[in-house]
């Protein structure tokens, strides 16, 4: 098994089904887009963004044959009071937790769990105990939802702004 990589939120460039975009209101997505600087490098166009999607992430990790993972961009969520997390999709009234075909993906509506944010700078955090309690709970919930351990968390944009999870 290899080590996997994932972000705490989802983004997409261009058209096509994107369930995460439907999980939060436009204001939340706009704030996320600004916090993560999610604009095209050449065009400046806003990228499509949405909260963490456990269904898509599990599928991606399966495709990577990943064991434990590095979770990036946790700092981007530091200004949010509440953070939505997609736990499943509802398609034609039925809850699904496995990534569907594109035909079903178009019709999918996200099932969302709201987690408490931490609303403070975490870029100084270099070990697990430095993180705010709600940030730890967020990471632990992600681990539960994806069925993989998180071994590293990036806490800022700089190369040395990360921690190894104990």
Stretch-by-stretch model annotation:
Residues 10-11, 61-65, 143-150:
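Structural signal for hydrophobic packing residues in well-ordered secondary-structure cores
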Residues 1-9:
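Single conserved hydrophobic/aromatic residue that forms the stacking wall/gate
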Residues 17, 33-102:
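C-terminal catalytic subdomain
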Residues 12, 31-41, 84, 114-122:
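Short acidic (Asp/Glu) and glycine-rich catalytic loops that position anionic groups and cofactors
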Residues 10-33:
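An anion-binding catalytic pocket shared by soluble metabolic enzymes
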Residues 27-43, 138-144:
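Short, hydrophobic/aliphatic alpha-helical segments
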Residues 13-20, 81-85, 162-166:
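Short acidic, glycine/serine/threonine-rich loops at helix termini
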Residues 84, 94-164:
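Internal helix-turn-beta structural module
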